[in-house]
Amino acid sequence: MRYENKEDTMTDLNALMATMITGKITDENEQNYYIQKEGLIFRLPKTEGDFAIGDDVTGFAYTDKAGKQRLTLTEPTATRDAYGWGTVTDVRKDLGVFLDVNIPEKDIVVSVDVLPELKELWPKKGDKLYVKLDVDNKDRIWGELAYPETFVQMAGKAYDNMQNQNLHAIVYRNKLSGSFVYLPENNMLGFIHPNERFSEPRLGQELDVRVIGYREIDRTLNLSLKPRSYEMLDADSQLIMTYLAQQGGHMPFYDKSAPEAIKATFAISKGQFKKALGGLMKQGKIKQDETGTTLL
């Protein structure tokens, strides 16, 4: 018996691809069950379950990397009917990006045609894309990026008390006006203005963002990729932290110390010194009193 695709079949394989189907086991060998659905045969590896000839089995129908019709009991993260997240596994500049959507021995391609024109904004390995599956007239399965309206429909509204929170976001749209992101843990949308980033993030890139406000009209969050002002004092703050560590966690200098003593020890002005101390105190790294400054 032939169990592979038949050129002369009268059934519609296209309609079954990338969907959940129920078929009947009609044959088996040592490695696989063979499941019939509307005149088509799908292979189900025996490693996925214990069945017998005559059993009805429900699973996800697809063609594997070898081009063979297959059924899996593993639930994919995306189907033809439902969007889901996929993880980028590979990038081909001539074809697009490959996604893992939890289908055994199968990655899904998101075509170059729907990716950003600037290839430096393409997703990289490990990035996340929100897709549903589509099947072309050659029965090939592709990943279809979610439209912006899809994110608007599924996302909730921002709360009033989110100012200055650090959150996790994923870029779902790049425009000249800025980066549009989805916050999966919060089910909210956000926007990063070009002034609030050092470089443009990739489509699908995961980001650590900070809330700086929200739009009243639609309750989407305004976000920043830039650190708080006191977190940007890298050189001076690090200088003080290093000195404190070398002195066993305490130094006799604090914000009331003489400018000359500060300059002689740290080679920075008293203004720089006080600003760095203030930032470190806000971060909870030090405390000050009349005896000096102590590491926490």
What does each of the following model-derived ranges do?
Residues 2-296:
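Single-stranded RNA-binding regions, centering on S1/OB-family and related RNA-binding modules
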